[in-house]
């Protein structure tokens, strides 16, 4: 039976599972459960291990150095995107940027690549200093949406260098651009049918859009520019719409 408590789950290792009890002795997780979430004896808590097995538990003992939870049920987690989807997104101003990472994580992408673009409003030094923060935001979002796996947030890369060096690693590349007009996701996949196992890359611009130099690069690399419709969206909204559109078109079975 699959339970849905609309609550975060917490990551453990199989070594924490002893008979029918989960023993939480990790200091950070123990502190979070006891002092931040203030769990009580008898409260239900969800855990998941590195093998993507989810445990429905009931807290049975809380001590200074360990919390114990009795396993009520366990089952393989189904909360994982079936397609290999990566998003390379130009870095945005802070609130929108964090929102973009959260939404990409919730939508199941495997990899998030921060890009430095010509029209990026954030200095490169600031972006590189935030690399660890980007991964932490993604990790926290995983717990909130009950994903079975963690996305990888890479080190920031310059857009042109990334596309020149790494575009060959993807089977489908979609550059989302306001100038694409009538060529949308549906038309793209009609011309380029998805094959199971294809690695898909979605590239999203920043608030100022792509520069003329970057558009020229897309043409040189024969990359498809994709429209999200007639409306102009904020960059973080465009990311959400683009990823959801790909998932809907390709399917997530």
Where are the model-predicted features located?
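A mid-sequence, solvent-exposed acidic-amphipathic segment
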Residues: 156-194, 200
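Structured adenosyl-cofactor binding patch, chiefly the S-adenosyl-L-methionine
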Residues: 212-253
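Short, acidic/turn-prone active-site loops that include or flank metal/cofactor-
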Residues: 180, 207-208, 230-233
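A C-terminal functional module that forms or caps the active site or interfaces directly
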Residues: 197-217
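Mobile, glycine- and charge-enriched loop segments
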Residues: 45, 70, 76-87, 194
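RNA substrate-binding interface of SAM-dependent RNA methyltransferases
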Residues: 78-174
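N-terminal positively charged helical leader segments and presequences
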Residues: 1-76
